[in-house]
Amino acid sequence: MKQLKTYHVFFLLAFAAPNLCSAQNISKDLINIHTLVDSINLSLGNNYIFPDKARMIATHLRSQAKKGAYNSFSTDPHKLASQVQADIYSIHRDPHMVVGYNPGWQGHQKGYTGPTEEEARWFAKFVKDNNFMFKKVELLPGNIGYLPFNIFVEHVKDAKPIIASALGFLANSSAIIIDLRENTGGEPEMVSQLESYFFKEKTLLNVIINRSNKDTAFYYADPAKTDGLTLSMPMYILTSKKTFSGGEDFTYGMQQAKRATIVGEVTGGGAHPTNPFSVGQGFLVQIPFARSSNPVTKTDWEGTGVIPDIKVESSKALIKAQELIFRERQAMAKTEEEKQKMEYLINGLHVNKDLGTLPVDEFDKFLGTYGPLNIYREGNKLFCNISGNISELAHISKNLFVLDGNAQIEFIKDDKGVYSMAKLLTSHGGLFEELRK
């Protein structure tokens, strides 16, 4: 089945080549409001995925134009575009529908306007210069793979070696976190390519139904596309309110296939692939021309967003996902040493996160000698001297501190409420107890 090609706001508006949208190109001619409204209505009527909504929008825009609601913007195309979009949203809010002004497109024929050869070359160079939007790959403590990814670009063939290198680096991770908190969308072909690395068998994850030409595209996670690289470890996806469109496509497909746990905020709620349509006089309308249908739910995330399995503020999602991974591994651990190792890693996530720095007078409760450990204070800082090796303690929570890069120390009260013992937990899961002298 023929694939659907979509060009998103990311390419055409947010990152348009400078020569396409410079201020010098703005026309000083008066905008013909009624002609513009008629052209917008025609494009919506012919292409919008929901014809009934297109008719409602058209009625409202004609009414607004007839009342003269746009007359004051006839010399300010950017404000006019914003007002028309606001009026569209007052009738039906589709986050993918965007009205913009870009005089660099004036020479294009009305209707669907794919990029020119010059624009396509510019976009291709842009994404290549930005490493196809792969900025970093990282191995976090506890052998957790971490890959932040902000845009699904269309250049799958060119990007494939980069994807394979990034995921190959994480192939021995015990779990993987894909961070889509800043992902605003992109191309379904790239979504499908990335999904393919996480399935052992060909799996249908999304169907896109096109109103314009009645075409339907089926998007599979297909291990045949990955040259033998398959990652089977537990997977966590981080989301935020900014996660949108293609980012939601990836998240929703993985969630419904039960391949990933979603951690973070409800996503933006845009499920409709779009194309840009020139409506004359330098104006463009990004029109959703198709809809997604998940093979499991038979619906999509339009308007509702993707609901996380674990809801948490986006700023806390990375730590939460790591904690979930460690808790799961701790519950499955067969030895006390492995359980303690996971506890060490969990504690390390919360250094200076829970209570911050304790008041100085609180430090004094811990001062003293515990076996070879001499705990003392200098000003508002707490230190440990072990045979001349001095470390500043970093607070985790209440009576728990980081001793150094390989150990944590917890002060334990006796039945009289006095801190009389120090427990040392090492990064390898070792546990040692020292009584206070």
What are these regions, as identified by a protein language model?
Residues 40, 88, 147, 178, ...:
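Terminal peptide-recognition signature
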Residues 26, 335-437:
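Peripheral terminal and inter-domain segments
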Residues 147-148, 173-185:
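Short acidic catalytic loops
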Residues 155-174:
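A short, well-ordered alpha-helical element
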Residues 134-160, 296:
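STAS-typified acidic loop motif
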Residues 1-27:
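Bacterial Sec-dependent N-terminal signal peptides
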Residues 185-238, 272-278, 289-295, 300, ...:
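Gly/Ser/Thr-rich loop/hinge elements
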Residues 51-140:
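Extended, small/polar residue-biased N-terminal targeting/export presequences
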